[in-house]
């Protein structure tokens, strides 16, 4: 919620789909909240408070039906619950490396459909290891979204954790 609240300070409006007492999303209420300018639905995959897993399959269908982008926060589920971006009709997926993926703190990522990459402005800007002869941020992936020196020890640690998860499963 904090990123959405931060965006609201810059004029972005959002609504919250209500939940039941046990934390289950009341998906039927989503239809009532639609406005002509609704562009996307952002949802967590599972609650960090009560563990309720959200009905992401239904949300993906809802978003497709209404032409909305669908972003899923998998901080609580990545590495523990199978996630298929295509089957869930996700446009983007955020994950943290240090929870279910068992990687180091300070790691994580944001997966986006290729079609969206050119539509998103990088949050940060800085040097890259490629195209150093120009002052412009590279337009190709992944360099477009990698300003400055990456957290190489963290990335290697996350890679090792992912390899371990693959061997264990």
Language model regions located:
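Pyridoxal 5′-phosphate
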Residues: 1-169
């Amino acid at each position: 919620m904090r990123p959405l609240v931060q965006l609201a300070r810059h004029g972005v409006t959002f609504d919250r789909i209500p939940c039941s007492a046990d934390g289950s999303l009341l998906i039927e209420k989503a239809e009532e909240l639609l406005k002509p300018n609704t562009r996307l639905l952002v949802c967590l995959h599972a609650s960090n408070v009560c563990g309720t897993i959200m009905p992401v399959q239904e949300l993906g269908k809802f978003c497709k039906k209404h032409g909305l982008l669908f972003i899923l926060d998998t901080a609580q589920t990545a590495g523990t619950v199978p996630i298929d971006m295509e089957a869930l009709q996700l446009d983007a997926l955020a994950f943290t490396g240090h929870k279910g993926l068992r990687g180091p703190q300070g790691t994580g990522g944001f997966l986006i459909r290729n079609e969206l990459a050119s539509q998103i402005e990088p949050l940060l800007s800085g040097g890259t290891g490629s195209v150093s002869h120009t002052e412009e941020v590279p337009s190709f992936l992944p360099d477009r979204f990698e300003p400055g020196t990456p957290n190489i020890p963290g990335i290697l640690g996350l890679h090792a954790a992912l390899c371990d998860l693959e061997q264990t499963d």
